[in-house]
Structure formats: structure tokens, C-alpha cells
Swiss-Prot record:
CDD domains: PTH
Pfam families: Pept_tRNA_hydro
Site (described: Stabilizes the basic form of H active site to accept a proton): 91
Molecular function per GO: peptidyl-tRNA hydrolase activity; tRNA binding
EC number(s) on file: 3.1.1.29
Family stated for the protein in its record: Belongs to the PTH family.
GO cellular component term of the entry, any: cytoplasm
Protein's name according to its UniProt entry: Peptidyl-tRNA hydrolase
Site (Discriminates between blocked and unblocked aminoacyl-tRNA) location in chain: 9
Function: Hydrolyzes ribosome-free peptidyl-tRNAs (with 1 or more amino acids incorporated), which drop off the ribosome during protein synthesis, or as a result of ribosome stalling.
HAMAP family registered for this protein in UniProt: Pept_tRNA_hydro_bact (MF_00083)
Amino acid sequence: MKMIVGLGNPGSKYAKTKHNIGFMVIDQLCEKYNVTLNKHDFEAEYGSFKYEGETVLLVKPLTFMNDSGRSVGPLMSYYQVGIDELLVIQDDMDLTMGKLRLRQKGSAGGHNGIKSIIAHTKSQTFKRLKIGIQHPQKSTVVNWVLTPFDKDGAPVINQAIDQACEESTTGVKMTTL
């Protein structure tokens, strides 16, 4: 079993914000593979589908971003998902808008959602698909990540979401995700 977790904040207030790029990718994967996130426990909403014979869990933690591990850790334990079978989709301010980067392991890099997952899984060796949201020019980090993409950024991000969906499912084909 593989688990793809999209990071974000719950609620309509945050739905289209930069910090919710992980949720946006999960939503598109759900649409593409006809998945309903109909399970609601472990402080998450999630659903599953089969991809080339492999069960894949799509997960949106319902904790706020900075406490995502509180949901991810118990879900992994319950479904016996190994750390090498986890892919986390996150925003990254250090990447230019729409750029994708797959990391096999590493520190949180200042991302509190990743820091929480590391704390709850006791490992840094899970894969992350980072999507660039660019560093704010003038606004504070909090204001930047909690605002929607502007008219110039939206088409770039929509393309990045499409690409992230492809990268996510390509990873599922690999033995170690």
C-alpha cells in the first residue's frame, strides 16, 4: 500500500491559498481517478484507489498544517504503510512559482507541516514532492502562504498541479514509490 498525503489547512477560508497546494493536488488526483475522500478518522479525510494493482491512499489531514503529523503517523500505523511508501506533497517558498522538486529524504527545511510529520513518524526518509510558490517580495511569509495565487501565478500553478499528479502516480509504479 502507498500513501500520498497533500498538505494544507482545512476549511473554505484556506481552500485556494498557496499553503494548500497539497490539498489541490489531492483534489485533482481524486477527480482523475474517481476517488471520494469518504473516510473520516485519524483527523483526516481519505480514500483509496487501485493503480496498476497497488492500493493507493489519498490523504488530506484535517489538522492545521503545522500539526499534520498528528494525522499522518496514526494513519500509517493503522494501514501498515512503511516510511518508504509515503509521498508528501507540500508547498516550497524556496522554489520558483510552479517548479517541482522530488526529494527522497531530508530535514524539514523550515516547513512546519513536514517538521510535524518527521516528529510523528520519527523519520526524515520519506519522499516529498515540493511545489514552488516562490518567496514573498514584500509581504510577510504568513500573509504570502495564506493568500490565493494571483492572476499571473494561477495558470502556472494549474500546470504544476497537473504535473504533480503525473509525478505522484509515476512514483506509485516504482517499488519504493
